[in-house]
């Protein structure tokens, strides 16, 4: 048996298991974790529980630390800013006449990059779009095709 917590990064998103690293973490608390996207702040939706070793992902990562009020404020501000980033990107896509559908915008906690998730029927040359967005947001821009996530 392995001790895990379940963490969610978006209000209605999927939850993921993390190693609580010996901490007594309760549902509703926030933790800082390292994910494939970078450092993230997530809400604990299931406190410490034991599950069968066979149900644990092979690469179970430990939490980095408990989130503090600054982290939670930053996460909430990022969610608000993602809405504006989404609309700005939509305008840029239209201006460039690109055949793609923007699905979502997402900042990393430290704002070192914004991921713009999109779908497209064919190949899209978004190099000029990325340049424009980098000039507007002054951070790394990462376009992510949903077709490549499955």
Regions found by a protein language model. Give the residues of each.
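Short edge beta-strands and adjacent turn/loop segments
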Residues: 100-110
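Helix N-cap motif at beta-to-alpha junctions
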Residues: 119-123
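Conserved small/polar residues in nucleotide/adenosyl-binding loops
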Residues: 147-150
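Short glycine/threonine-rich beta-strand-turn micro-motifs
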Residues: 110-118
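N-terminal, positively charged regions that mediate nucleic acid binding
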Residues: 1-52
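A common structural junction motif
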Residues: 133-140
């Amino acid at each position: 048996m392995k001790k895990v917590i379940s963490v969610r990064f978006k209000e209605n998103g999927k939850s993921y298991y993390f190693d609580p690293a010996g901490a007594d973490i309760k549902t509703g608390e926030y933790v800082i974790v390292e994910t494939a996207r970078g450092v993230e702040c997530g809400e604990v939706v299931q406190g410490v529980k034991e599950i069968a070793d066979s149900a644990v992902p092979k690469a179970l990562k430990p939490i980095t630390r408990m989130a503090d009020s600054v982290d939670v404020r930053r996460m909430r501000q990022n969610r608000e800013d993602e809405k504006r980033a989404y609309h700005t990107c939509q305008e840029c896509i239209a201006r460039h006449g690109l055949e793609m559908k923007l699905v979502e915008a997402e900042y990393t906690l430290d704002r070192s990059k914004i991921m713009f998730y999109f779908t497209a029927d064919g190949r899209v040359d978004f190099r000029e779009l990325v340049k424009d967005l980098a000039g507007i947001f002054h951070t790394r821009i990462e376009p992510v095709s949903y077709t490549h996530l499955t």
